[in-house]
C-alpha cells in the first residue's frame, strides 16, 4: 500500500511570515496538531506542532495584559518556532515504511512530497489507525481467530481447506512474528459473520487440528 492512497491531501499550511497567532487559530479551526511551513514554490521548509506553539506561548502566570499578549503573539512568526528541514516522505512510499518512521522517530505525522519535493499531502498517526481499520475489515464484524504455525511453505493450506469446507468467507489476513519462538508465525484471520452452529463447529475443528491462540466474536455496532 502506498501512502498516496491514504494521505490527507487538503493540507493546511503556513508561510515563514505567518504569525504564531494565526497558526494557533488554524490548528483550533481545523482540529489539527501540525502545520507544514512552505516557501512560495510549495517546498516544505519547516513544520510546526501544537507543542511548538505551546512552548512559544507566554505562561498563564504572565503579567502581560490582553493587548500586550495579542501583540506578542502577532509578532512571533512561523519561522521563529518551526522545526526546519523536517523529515518528509514520498507519495509512493509504502504505508509500512511510513509507520516505521513515525514509530522510530516518535513523531505524530509527516509531510508528503512528490518527486519534485513539492508538498502534496500529510500522513498522521490518526491516518494509520484508519488504515488498520480498513485493511483489517473490522467494520464487517464477524470473528477474528489467531493461529500459530511453524514457519514454512504451504503450512496454511490445510487451514484454508477447512475454512472452505465450512463455507467461511475470509475478510482479511495478517501475520506477525510469534512470541512462541523464532521459527513460529502468528496468523490473524477475520471471517465474515456465520450461522452460529456452523461457526461453533469450525471453532472446534480449528482447535483440534491447529494451535489456535484465540477466537473473538466482535460486535462493531457497540463501538
Locate predicted features.
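Conserved short beta-strand edge segments in small beta-sheet-based binding/regulatory domains
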Residues: 171-173, 203-223
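Short acidic-hydrophobic, aromatic-tinged amphipathic segments that line or gate anion-handling sites
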Residues: 14, 89-90
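Short, ordered loop/turn segments at secondary-structure junctions
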Residues: 40, 115, 175-178, 218
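A short, glycine/Asx- and small/polar-enriched loop/turn
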Residues: 181-187
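Tandem CBS (Bateman) regulatory domains
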Residues: 1-10, 50-87, 94, 99-103, ...
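A glycine-centered beta-loop-beta connector
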Residues: 27, 35-52, 102, 110-126, ...
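Basic, Lys/Arg-rich alpha-helical nucleic-acid-recognition elements, primarily the DNA-binding modules
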Residues: 1-53, 57-59
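Short acidic/polar active-site loop segments enriched in Thr and Asp
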Residues: 33, 108, 169
Amino acid at each position: 500500500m502506498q501512502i498516496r492512497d491514504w494521505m490527507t491531501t487538503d493540507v493546511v499550511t503556513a508561510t515563514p511570515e505567518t504569525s504564531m497567532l494565526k497558526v494557533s487559530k488554524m490548528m483550533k479551526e481545523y482540529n489539527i496538531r501540525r502545520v507544514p511551513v512552505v516557501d512560495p514554490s510549495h517546498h516544505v521548509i519547516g513544520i510546526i506542532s501544537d507543542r511548538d506553539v505551546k512552548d512559544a506561548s507566554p505562561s498563564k502566570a504572565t503579567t502581560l495584559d490582553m493587548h500586550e499578549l495579542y501583540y506578542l503573539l502577532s509578532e512571533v512568526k512561523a519561522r521563529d518556532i518551526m522545526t526546519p528541514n523536517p523529515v518528509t516522505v514520498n507519495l509512493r512510499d509504502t504505508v509500512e515504511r511510513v509507520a516505521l518512521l513515525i514509530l522510530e522517530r516518535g513523531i505524530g505525522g509527516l509531510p508528503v512530497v512528490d518527486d519534485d519535493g513539492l508538498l502534496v499531502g500529510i500522513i498522521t498517526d490518526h491516518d494509520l489507525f484508519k488504515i488498520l481499520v480498513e485493511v483489517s475489515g473490522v467494520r464487517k464484524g464477524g470473528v477474528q481467530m489467531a493461529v500459530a504455525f511453524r514457519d514454512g511453505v504451504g503450512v496454511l493450506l490445510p487451514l484454508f481447506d477447512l475454512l472452505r469446507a465450512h463455507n467461511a468467507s475470509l475478510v482479511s489476513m495478517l501475520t506477525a512474528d510469534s512470541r512462541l519462538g523464532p521459527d513460529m508465525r502468528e496468523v490473524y484471520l477475520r471471517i465474515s459473520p456465520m450461522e452460529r452452529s456452523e461457526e461453533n463447529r469450525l471453532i472446534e475443528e480449528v482447535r483440534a487440528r491447529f494451535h489456535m491462540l484465540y477466537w473473538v466474536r466482535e460486535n462493531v455496532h457497540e463501538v
